[in-house]
Regions:
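Class II aminoacyl-tRNA synthetase catalytic cores and aaRS-like
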Residues: 1-120
Length: 120
């Protein structure tokens, strides 16, 4: 059984860059690039901030699963920690695998992100 790292520990720098880790959590957002990459923001409840997981189109399930992930889908991701090339985070995971544990049955009815909320 793989040992699962907490995202809070990864973001706090408790695990060194270059280390291979496994995380479990829920997709907050997915962005796709023209370069054949998907950027997944994953959270596990251990931190308010998500971890960015970079999935390349060379992954076996890239077209069948990764490109269909929506907010709320549960995943297990394994990969290597690396210094982030983007803004907003210092570390990211270069994914070797992203396995879907659970799908959101009706993504259109899934609660809107808080960013879209206009008030309480």
């Amino acid at each position: 059984m793989k040992q699962v790292a907490r995202i809070a520990d990864v973001l706090a720098g408790q695990l060194p860059e270059g280390q291979r880790v496994t995380i479990q959590g829920w997709v907050r957002t997915r962005r796709d690039s023209k370069a054949g990459l998907s950027f997944l923001q994953i959270h596990d409840g251990s931190s308010f901030a998500p971890l960015q997981v970079v999935a390349q189109n060379a992954l076996d399930n890239y077209e069948s699963d990764i490109q269909h992930l929506t907010a709320g889908c549960a995943v297990t991701a394994t990969g290597t920690l690396a210094e982030s090339q983007g803004k907003g985070q210092s570390v990211e995971m270069q994914a070797e695998s992203v396995d879907v544990v659970g799908w959101v049955d009706d993504p259109d009815s899934y609660p809107e992100p808080l960013l879209n909320a206009t008030g309480l």
